[in-house]
A protein has these predicted regions:
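GHKL-family ATPase ATP-binding module
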Residues: 1-13, 23, 45-47, 55-57, ...
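Mature N-terminal segment immediately following signal peptide/propeptide cleavage
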Residues: 15-28
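Conserved short strand/loop->alpha-helix "switch" segment adjacent to the catalytic nucleotide/phosphoryl-transfer site
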Residues: 28-47
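Residues immediately C-terminal
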Residues: 55-56, 83-84, 506-507
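Short conserved segment of the HATPase_c
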Residues: 84-107
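C-terminal interaction appendages of subunits in large macromolecular complexes
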Residues: 386-405, 420-425, 436, 440-442, ...
């Protein structure tokens, strides 16, 4: 971290808070400002306030941020930065503190005087959080005094008042989300913990402490990583076997931009690249990732040829160069341009040039100085290249077997009549008997059925050639029609709902996990785009006379049972547990699990790719000890276990 004491005296006052527009319509249209009023929007409130503190850290004025979840799901964020300005803001005649919390797009980022780079736009988040809180109070330690303001749903309830004296600087914000605005106001500790850990990795030397005071015993963790993103790579790779002991670290800057990259290869087959711009995760990549990938491939080919490891005519493709790679890319720039539907892609072309230059120069130097590591990486890439060629041959064999042009559809696929992918859905069903019931019960206009049978491949332990050669997965690849790995093209997807329908038992859960591992590793855009669903079949059928009802859980079974008894507590209710989808007749399967009007589908989403990678590695990978530890820690959360 930069030296903070030298910088505290630098001016950060009201003249650096620019007002762009009034705070309007936030409560009418909260989704425009925080994405949604669901759990993700609720947690976004915390990120907005923490981002303001991190801006202080980025500028070199803050070394410790404390986040506390108090009883009643009250949030408190405290930092030891300079403190939000309290003097009069020239444009409005109001205190800067009031402007920051009551005017949208009031912040110290816009003019360039307050912050060189910024993640949250300082002040934008504060006013939105204020508008969506039942109440909010802010205490600023500055100029030897403690200044306090209080608000309710965006309105001032206590003007700025001096409430004491202080010998330090900083800002503390406490707020309670407004239950009128949110579907739920209960915070998930783990969601906040993961985000805070990520920010601690990205800001080397910054200490972030998170505390949950809601339980009988407070839970607290203080995180500070002097190694920054190098330690982030170590964390991601902790359950994998690294090919070289330490992550390779590179950094460089140009004008008002800088980048840092850490990477390490492991003996697995999957690439994990996590990128950020101004501490904001960019899951769709962008120019910084493009520059990184191009430079990595060029540097490896260049060194391979110079060292004689690559023979004449040999070359390593981009995909091969990234097999088993874990990399974290972090860039900081003054005017980030975010693109894509979710603003999750960096569009600044100058970052491609900067990252490309830094990675090529630093990685080339590293390979020259560490020839043993260089040889290991290039030989792994060559092995990947041979496997990719074998996969290509396997693909060609399938094509030849099924006709000259493209894939014919799998024999077991019962396709639908409609050809518009946006209207169609593919049910991937466990077993032939369930597939038969599903085929008879479906609406053939828009529902296709693909039964799977036998033991499926665990792709966590397999390369692409093994995947293409697997007779259980080939039908899935063919039916979806969008390819695999780097060749996957979401525009060729034949169904926009891919629904896994498996029994509600251990075997069904295993099949779901194997399929999700496959989609995550080889068809990631399926999950990122929200195309994958899990059907929720009922667990029980309850009968009383001619009346039948179904239940999806033990609690629902008990409630329905009581309802069916009505005024006669001794009435006989026959309760049958469904052992499998194949036991249901076609009409039952349609009504309970396939009818869009009555079914329950769970969309598979990916909020934290690093955590998902860790879970798949632990559960499906080679190492036994991490899997055993995971099961011991999480057994209490398990459901649907047959004994």
């Amino acid at each position: 971290m930069p030296d903070i004491t030298d910088k505290i005296t630098q001016e950060y006052d009201a003249s650096q808070i620019q007002v762009l527009e009034g705070l309007e319509a936030v409560r009418k249209r909260p989704g425009m400002y925080i994405g949604s009023t669901s759990s993700s929007g609720l947690h976004h409130l915390v990120y907005e306030i923490v981002d303001n503190s991190i801006d202080e850290a980025l500028a070199g004025y803050c070394s410790h941020i404390e986040l506390t979840i108090e009883p009643g799901d009250i949030i408190c964020v405290s930092d030891n930065g300079r403190g939000i300005p309290v003097d009069i803001q020239p444009q409005t005649g109001k205190s800067a503190l009031e402007v920051v919390f009551t005017v949208l797009h009031a912040g110290g980022k816009f003019g360039g005087g307050g912050y060189k780079v910024s993640g949250g736009l300082h002040g934008v988040g504060a006013s939105v959080v204020n508008a969506l809180s039942e109440w909010l109070e802010v205490n600023v330690h500055k100029n030897g005094k403690i200044y306090q303001m209080k608000f309710s749903r965006g309105d001032i309830t206590q003007p700025m008042t001096v409430v004491g004296e202080t010998d330090h600087t900083g800002t503390t914000v406490r707020f309670k989300p407004d239950p009128v605005m949110f579907e739920d106001t209960v915070y998930d500790y783990e969601t906040l913990h993961v985000r805070m850990r990520e920010q601690a990795f990205l800001n080397a030397g910054l200490r972030i402490t998170i505390t949950d005071q809601r339980g009988e015993e407070p839970v607290s963790e203080s995180m500070c990583y002097e190694g920054g993103i190098r330690e982030f790579v170590d964390f991601i790779n902790k359950n994998k076997t690294a090919l070289h002991p330490e992550a390779i670290y590179m950094a460089g800057e140009r004008s008002d931009s800088m980048c840092e990259i850490a990477l390490q290869y492991n003996d697995g087959y999957n690439e994990v690249i996590v990128s950020f711009a101004n501490n904001i995760h960019t899951p769709e990549g962008g120019m910084h990732e493009t520059g990184f990938k191009a430079a990595l491939t060029r540097a490896l080919n260049n060194y391979g040829k110079k060292s004689g490891i690559l023979k004449e005519g040999d070359s390593i493709s981009g995909e091969d160069s990234r097999e088993g790679l874990t990399a974290v890319i972090s860039v900081k720039l003054t005017n980030p341009q975010f693109e894509g539907q979710t603003k999750a892609k960096l569009g600044n072309s100058e970052m491609r040039t900067l990252v490309d230059s830094v990675v090529f120069d630093r990685l080339s130097q590293f390979l020259e100085e560490n020839p043993a590591v260089g040889r290991m990486i290039i030989e792994k890439a060559l092995t990947a290249s041979r496997a990719r060629e074998a996969a290509r041959r396997a693909r060609e064999n399938i094509r030849r077997k099924n006709g000259l042009e493209g894939f014919n559809m799998p024999d077991k696929l019962r396709d639908c009549n409609d050809r518009d992918p946006s209207l169609t859905e593919l049910y991937i069903v466990e077993g032939d008997s369930a597939g038969g019931s599903a085929t008879q019960g479906r609406d053939s206009r828009f529902q296709a059925i693909l039964p799977l049978w036998g033991k499926m491949l665990n792709v966590e332990k397999a390369r692409a050639d093994k995947v293409y050669g697997n007779d259980k997965l080939t039908p899935v690849i063919t039916a979806l029609g969008a390819g695999l790995g780097d060749e996957f093209d979401i525009n060729k997807l034949r169904y926009h709902k891919v629904i896994i329908m498996a029994d509600a038992d251990v075997d069904g859960s295993h099949i779901r996990t194997l399929l999700l591992t496959f989609f995550f590793r080889f068809m990631r855009p399926l999950i990122d785009g929200g195309y994958v669903y899990s059907a929720i079949p009922p667990l029980y059928k309850l009968n009383r006379g001619k009346t039948s009802r179904i239940a999806f859980s033990d609690e629902e079974r008990d409630r329905i049972s009581a309802e069916m008894r009505g005024d006669n507590p001794n009435a006989k209710i026959d309760i049958n547990r469904f052992k499998g989808l194949g036991e249901m007749d076609p009409h039952e399967l349609w009504e309970t699990t396939m009818n869009p009007e009555t079914r329950t589908l769970k969309q598979i989403t990916l909020e934290d790719a690093v955590h998902a990678d860790e879970v798949f590695t632990v559960l499906m990978g080679e190492k036994v000890e991490p899997r055993k530890a995971f099961i011991e820690q999480n057994a209490k959360y398990a459901v649907n276990i047959d004994i």
